From Swiss-Prot:
Keywords, sorted A to Z: Aminoacyl-tRNA synthetase, ATP-binding, Cytoplasm, Ligase, Nucleotide-binding, Protein biosynthesis
Name of the encoding gene: aspS
GO terms assigned for molecular function: aspartate-tRNA ligase activity; aspartate-tRNA(Asn) ligase activity; ATP binding; nucleic acid binding
Subcellular location: Cytoplasm
Binding site for ATP: R221, D222, E223, Q230, E492, G544, L545, D546, R547
Domain of life of the organism encoding this protein: Bacteria
Protein name in UniProt: Aspartate--tRNA(Asp/Asn) ligase
Native organism: Cupriavidus taiwanensis (strain DSM 17343 / BCRC 17206 / CCUG 44338 / CIP 107171 / LMG 19424 / R1)
Amino acid sequence: MSSMRTHYCGLVTEQFSGQEVALTGWVQRRRDHGGVIFIDLRDREGLVQVVCDPDRPEMFKAAEEIRNEFCIRVTGKVRPRPAGTENANLTSGKIEVLCHELTVLNPSVTPPFQLDDDNLSETTRLTHRVLDLRRPQMQYNLRLRYKVAMEVRKFLDAQGFIDIETPMLGKSTPEGARDYLVPSRVNPGHFFALPQSPQIFKQMLMVSGFDRYYQITKCFRDEDLRADRQPEFTQIDCETSFLTEQEIRDLFEDMMRTVFKNAIDVDLDAKFPVMEFREAMARFGSDKPDLRVKLEFTELTEVMKDVDFKVFSGPANSDNGRVVGLRVPGGGAISRGEIDAYTQFVGIYGAKGLAWIKVNEVAKGRDGLQSPIVKNLHDAAIAEILKRTGAQDGDIIFFGADKAKVVNDSIGALRLKIGHSDFGKANGLFEDAWKPLWVVDFPMFEYDEEDARWVAMHHPFTSPKDEHLEYLETDPGKCLAKAYDMVLNGWEMGGGSVRIFRSDIQSKVFRALKINDEEARAKFGYLLDALQYGAPPHGGLAFGLDRIVTMMAGADSIRDVIAFPKTQRAQDLLTQAPSSVDEKQLRELHIRLRTAEPKPNA
């Protein structure tokens, strides 16, 4: 391999017995057993046991002085381990290396934690990320990330895609998430924006005739962070010309199947199921449903319109209200304390409470039910609830009644919490499997109550369905888009759409968004101009590489599959970024800081 080593530690196996090897790595552990020193030597491929015998005094003296995380080089002979001392958990577990020579390449100060400590806080791990990345799980995660990216490139290259870079410094378009702004020193008072996606550039590449484009690139969004969000993230960005929506979906479904098979030997469905946005929201309250959870909403809005219970009838008679039931088979065993905990949980999502009915005996109707709300419901409503939910003896039915968004968010989250719980898994409410699907036919627009206007659900370059073009000017709320998301186990793996390729339709969409011609020209004139030069029909997808690898690795957060991530406060604890800069730098950029005004006392 090199003049310093002949093999990786973790790849030395019994086939090398009797051979001389040179190994380099870090001391995982040093043990002194009856005058013989054992060293667990670690590199990126794993561990090997090195035996240091006192018969070689100079080498043995060096071995006595080493400590954890010293970087060393050893030479020695591979031999079988004595019978009964093999370690089946290691690739090298049947052999050991009898050390002939040991060199300390670099000592180490005492690490702030043991690398095999699984209870470290994330703050400690991110502050000492260099050491954290030495841990086997992190080594695995980042190598898996490389493998996924490599498999994506292999697939797309074979399909005739061309890897083209697009600019990192672009124009700010204050739509959607906030941009990260970069001041221009040579153009005082002007700013670049880091790209939220290469969306417009890849569309212009299609106009330029490149036909099939991709890049694996960084994108930036200055938004509030969650477990699956970072201010900078990596996107597998793809665009094609002259393909229909179905052909685009088929192509990238095949890509995802290939990547999962080659990267982690998982066979995804031969054909992903397809679900309309409307159906996903009706059944699961989410446009990215986790199909592993075997619980669904039951629509009860109509049933509750005439009940003498304002908690239900109020939302049922409201234009933007919704009432649903969530039947949990066997849920009668859920304790009152657990119900109280679930009530607190749905409150996180804006729910004002959590109504429930335990079904003791269906055949007895009202008398077979246990709940404080039964007295508020007439017999017809109770009968309809039991019928529609398919309730059986021993079940519990939870209810959501509020604005549709609150119901979808709160009962949707409750569905997942119960399904993923020990109770859910023990009662067959969760299937441990890979469950992909396409969600399609998204609305083009959603209404922003605060600004009293329509906003694009995806982005303003998404094409409306051909049969809905008339709604752009008459009723934008009815307009559906040629948009599609690939969902896997409740995570959006990628999303895309067929794009608008005619400038007249693009202008109509801008007008529906209350972006007048002058504003559209100022923000997107270069795209509108490009569309006039025979732009081809085109569309594509963008996949979140971080999310894909997180799912494959079974990691808790995308921060576990990124080498140097930011915290949920968008800070890098290793380098202490972001940081203040000196006055000279600000003057060169023609920037003066404005001190935040103190908030008045309430």
